[in-house]
């Protein structure tokens, strides 16, 4: 290509003039347009982590179970007895806002490829979703499209979606978040890496043909939205889950041979990123022959081929002499396969087109030599006033029962049954518990007796409001809550992946939020013994200058030695004792209650003592494994009253049944502060449990042994939730409000939403 490189062309490629000057310095000349395109995607935030890398290096990334940490397609941890788990979480936010079905679907496809590229068979997926105000005209459209895309792709792949969370807030009106998680299992001694090792080895393309979809998707994901957002639809990839299924099976068959030296998913920045990253990890060069790439569209240029983000494609470095073996297996699975390059020892990345070199670049500046910024940081200027807000000025509600009903109808708190009904969570029968609880529990079924009975727990979560008010503390809460959820099912947390969603890093207050959240995640992971083994950063989540809440999503994995010794959230037996592991402080700063009922998003998030957190988790984990408990449920959004209601309602059968066997509870809560604050405050490190009377003494002794406080509250029974001196509401009424929250959004039932409180936008939302 001979197009002149003007400042306008440089800007269109997402590079600053200073960065372009650095490109010229590395090359000692002007780049051509194809080379500029390569630098554009490799130096994008999405690929280079240029604003975040200096902070990410502070994460704890090693531990006794870590087999592969950050830097590869997915992290890998040791499950024992020769088995390992590969897992990762990744964002597809920008594409999902532009085209929700395909954006979400290809997000699932991409994270599945990241996992099976490591040599693992995916066995479970999860997701964390954020949408705007429930009454916003685009919220229902995005919710329906994203959920359909996730379900459509995952269901076709035969990988169950077993866990997730969905939250709503006005800050996501112009920028939804779609964070996808996948976990797979593999032999601990057969991990495949994305490396272009072995000079002379062939580089092979396998999978679907290359088209023009997704060109500059990585660059688009590294810029904020504006009024022209709808024009960016061509940068959204189009997925084919049936092709991905063939690619998965072909790769797993290839991994059983000695043909694979290295393998890399063609994800963001497509052929360019996969080939450059493989060369960079090996310290080698590559010669690529673009005229050999299988194409599905005529007239594609080298620029388009290199930057296409067509889905369901892999780049494989084969052992020399094993090309026919690779061809045979790929042909068997009806995949395109071609030799498209060779590994060289030159340290240069060269692209050829019909005998002519169209790009000749050094590898290092594209990888480790990419720009790294220590951007200016300053606390958000709104925080002093928000922290100074006098919570005692909040009026007390006239009827705590009505308040609870309104909170349960809030889409963030309401049942997500409509969502997980769109997902095939029972495929392969790996799920040991139904979705909707604290953490998913997945059976490990390998056919090997050594693995029989083992299970994996999965939890995902974040709290953007906490992270705005105190990024360091809010991020710690995200880690602690995921670990607490895993403890509720009897699991031991072992490792973390993350998806760090933030606004424009060029704004000092956003960069400060990012750095503080990273510091908080690191501190909590060190305290809880959960190293970070993989992750993703998504910046520029802004529309016309309005950024999202800082949302560092955590995906945590835990191990269960005996999957039959787990626990669910629901109260089960009349007469069971109800107790709270933890304390009652009535901390409402940053709470759903304060936002929903009083239009305020202010104060400080609840205090968090990580030593106390560990004691609470250890108490419940050991109690579950000893078989002492009938139920265990994390106390978080909406506080104690919401947790009690959920435990009563989760006893029921799915919506639509003629009779729902709800079960009630009668409790007496000590009130060290205002009743509404104690009932709806979101104090940290609390788990609500129930148990047979005969287990109570042993449970109290266990809690004392672990150093965790326990408060006996009451008993399970009846058909009403009664909190003595505060509220008494039939469980059927609670369940009706709880189950209608999300369907009301989909009906665009603004009148109902306003009446129930679910669409009440805060009068003073966070800046």
From Swiss-Prot:
Residues given in the record as Mg(2+) 1 binding sites: 90, 536
Residues annotated to bind Mg(2+) 2: 114, 265
Presence of the UniProt keyword Metal-binding in the record: yes
Binding-site residues for ATP, renumbered to this chain: 49, 88, 498, 535
Pathway where this protein functions: Purine metabolism; IMP biosynthesis via de novo pathway; 5-amino-1-(5-phospho-D-ribosyl)imidazole from N(2)-formyl-N(1)-(5-phospho-D-ribosyl)glycinamide: step 1/2
Top-level EC class as recorded in UniProt: ligase
GO biological process, one term: 'de novo' IMP biosynthetic process
Binding site residues for substrate: 91-94, 113, 237, 309-311, 538
InterPro entries named among the record's database cross-references: PRibForGlyAmidine_synth_PurL (IPR010074), PurL_linker (IPR041609), PurM-like_C_dom (IPR010918), PurM-like_C_sf (IPR036676), PurM-like_N (IPR016188), PurM-like_N_sf (IPR036921)
Localization (cell): Cytoplasm
Molecular-function annotations in GO: ATP binding; magnesium ion binding; phosphoribosylformylglycinamidine synthase activity
Active-site residues (renumbered): 46, 92
Annotated GO CC locations: cytoplasm
Family listed: Belongs to the FGAMS family.
NCBIfam families hit by this protein: FGAM_synth_II, PRK01213.1
Subunit description: Monomer. Part of the FGAM synthase complex composed of 1 PurL, 1 PurQ and 2 PurS subunits.
Record-given protein name: Phosphoribosylformylglycinamidine synthase subunit PurL
Species: Anaeromyxobacter sp. (strain Fw109-5)
């Amino acid at each position: 290509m001979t197009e002149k490189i003007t400042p306008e062309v440089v800007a269109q490629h997402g590079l600053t003039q200073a960065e372009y000057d650095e490109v010229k310095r590395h090359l000692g000349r002007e780049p051509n347009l194809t080379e500029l395109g390569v630098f554009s995607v490799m130096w994008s935030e999405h690929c280079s982590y240029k604003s975040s890398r200096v902070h990410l290096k502070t994460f704890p990334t090693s531990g006794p179970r870590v087999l592969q940490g950050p830097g590869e397609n997915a992290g890998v941890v040791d499950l024992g007895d020769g088995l390992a788990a590969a897992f990762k979480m990744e964002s597809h936010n920008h594409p999902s806002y532009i085209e929700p079905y395909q954006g979400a679907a290809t997000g699932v496809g991409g994270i599945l490829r990241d996992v099976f590229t490591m040599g693992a068979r995916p066995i479970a997926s999860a997701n964390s979703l954020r949408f705007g105000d429930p009454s916003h005209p685009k919220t229902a459209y995005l919710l329906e499209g994203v959920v359909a895309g996730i379900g459509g792709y995952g269901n076709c792949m035969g990988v169950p979606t077993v866990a997730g969370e969905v939250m709503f807030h006005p800050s996501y009106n112009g920028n939804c978040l779609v964070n996808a998680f996948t976990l797979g299992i593999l032999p601990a001694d057969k991990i495949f890496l994305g490396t272009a090792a072995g000079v002379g080895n062939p580089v092979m393309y396998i999978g679907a043909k290359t088209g023009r979809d997704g060109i500059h998707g990585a660059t688009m994901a590294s810029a904020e939205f504006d009024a022209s957002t709808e024009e960016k639809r061509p940068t959204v990839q189009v997925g084919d889950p049936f092709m991905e299924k063939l690619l998965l099976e072909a790769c797993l068959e290839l991994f059983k041979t000695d043909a694979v030296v290295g393998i890399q998913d063609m994800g963001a920045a497509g052929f360019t990123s996969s080939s450059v990253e493989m060369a960079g990890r090996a310290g080698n060069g590559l010669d690529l022959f673009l005229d050999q790439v299988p194409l599905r569209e005529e007239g594609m240029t080298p620029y388009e081929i290199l930057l296409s983000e067509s889905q369901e494609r892999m780049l494989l470095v084969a052992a020399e002499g094993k090309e026919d073996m690779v061809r045979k297996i790929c042909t068997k699975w009806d995949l395109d396969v071609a030799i498209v390059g060779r590994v060289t020892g030159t340290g240069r990345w060269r692209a050829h087109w019909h005998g002519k070199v169209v790009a000749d670049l050094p590898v290092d500046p594209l990888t480790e030599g990419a720009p790294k910024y220590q951007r200016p940081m300053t606390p958000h200027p709104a925080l002093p006033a928000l922290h100074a807000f006098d919570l005692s000025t909040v009026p007390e509600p006239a009827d705590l029962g009505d308040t609870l009903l309104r909170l349960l109808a809030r889409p963030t708190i309401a049942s997500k049954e409509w969502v997980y009904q769109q997902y095939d969570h029972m495929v392969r029968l790996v799920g040991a518990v139904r979705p909707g609880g604290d953490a998913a529990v997945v059976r490990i079924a390998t056919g090997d007796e050594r693995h029989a009975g083992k299970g994996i727990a999965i939890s995902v979560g974040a709290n953007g409001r906490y992270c705005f008010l105190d990024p360091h503390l809010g991020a710690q809460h995200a880690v602690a809550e995921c670990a607490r959820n895993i403890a509720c099912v009897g699991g031991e947390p072992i490792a973390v992946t993350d998806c760090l969603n933030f606004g424009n890093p060029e704004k000092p207050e956003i960069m400060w939020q990012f750095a503080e959240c990273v510091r908080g995640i690191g501190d909590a992971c060190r305290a809880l013994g959960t190293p970070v083994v993989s992750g993703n950063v998504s910046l520029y989540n802004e529309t016309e200058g309005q950024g999202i809440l800082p949302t560092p999503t955590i995906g945590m994995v835990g191990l269960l030695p005996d999957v039959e010794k787990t626990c669910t959230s629901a109260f089960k037996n009349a007469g069971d004792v109800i107790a709270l592991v933890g304390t009652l402080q009535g901390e409402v700063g940053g709470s759903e209650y304060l936002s929903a009922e009083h239009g305020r998003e202010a104060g400080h998030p609840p205090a968090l003592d990580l030593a106390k957190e560990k004691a609470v988790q250890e108490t419940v984990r050991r109690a579950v494994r000893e078989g002492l408990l009938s139920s265990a449920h994390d106390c978080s959004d909406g506080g104690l009253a919401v947790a009690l209601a959920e435990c009563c309602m989760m006893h029921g059968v799915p919506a639509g049944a003629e009779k729902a066997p709800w079960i009630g509870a009668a409790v007496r809560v000590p009130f060290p502060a205002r009743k509404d604050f104690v009932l709806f405050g979101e104090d940290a490190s609390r788990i609500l449990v129930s148990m047979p009377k005969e287990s109570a003494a042993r449970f109290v002794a266990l809690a004392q042994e672990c150093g965790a406080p326990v408060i006996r509250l009451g008993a399970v029974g009846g058909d009403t939730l009664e909190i003595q001196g505060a509220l008494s509401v039939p469980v059927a009424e609670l369940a009706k409000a709880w189950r209608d929250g999300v369907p009301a959004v989909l009906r665009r039932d603004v009148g109902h939403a306003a009446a129930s409180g679910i669409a009440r936008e805060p009068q003073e939302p966070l800046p």
